A protein has these predicted regions:
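Alpha-helical transmembrane segments of multi-pass membrane proteins
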Residues: 14-31
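Membrane-interface helix caps and helix-loop-helix hairpins in membrane proteins
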Residues: 96-109, 127-132
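N-terminal membrane topogenic signal
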Residues: 1-10, 55
Length: 142
């Protein structure tokens, strides 16, 4: 795949992921917000509502990654093509999880989340530990 095309796909994937996350709460998908669904299923490991504010920091770091990726010279980042493809997959899985979650497909949302976590772990595996990419996806992975 040509690197310029991959850069465009990375940028568009990020923008679509952010837009879908925005829609999930501003115009709730399936008529219910992400937080309302979380509250619907009382579990022992659901964090307090304020802890979800970490997503602002995560998405800011992901934006920095996207800017670095899109503006980098071809080959400037180790495993650049693979990282771009894995990032696009992570965006698709993020959107897929939102759709499953909002339409109350809990088993499907769990499976998508597992794939999402595997994808984030794969990104970390192919990233050098000293760069912004590693920091970004370390925070994203949790």
């Amino acid at each position: 795949m040509k690197m310029i095309l991959l850069k465009i796909i990375v940028l568009l994937s990020f923008l679509l992921m952010i837009y879908m996350n925005y829609l999930a709460n501003s115009k709730p998908l399936g008529g219910i917000s992400t937080g309302d669904i979380s509250a619907k299923y009382n579990t022992m490991f659901t964090p307090s509502g304020f802890t979800f504010s970490i997503w602002g920091i995560i998405y800011l770091l992901v934006l920095v990654f996207v800017i670095v990726f899109v503006t980098a010279q071809t080959g400037a980042l180790p495993n650049m093509s693979l990282l771009g493809i894995l990032f696009v997959v992570s965006c698709v899985l993020n959107i897929g999880w939102l759709l499953c979650w909002h339409f109350d497909k809990i088993l499907a949302s769990t499976l998508v989340m597992i794939l999402f976590l595997i994808t984030l772990l794969s990104i970390l595996e192919f990233t050098s530990p000293e760069g912004i990419t590693y920091i970004t996806f370390s925070v994203y992975f949790g």
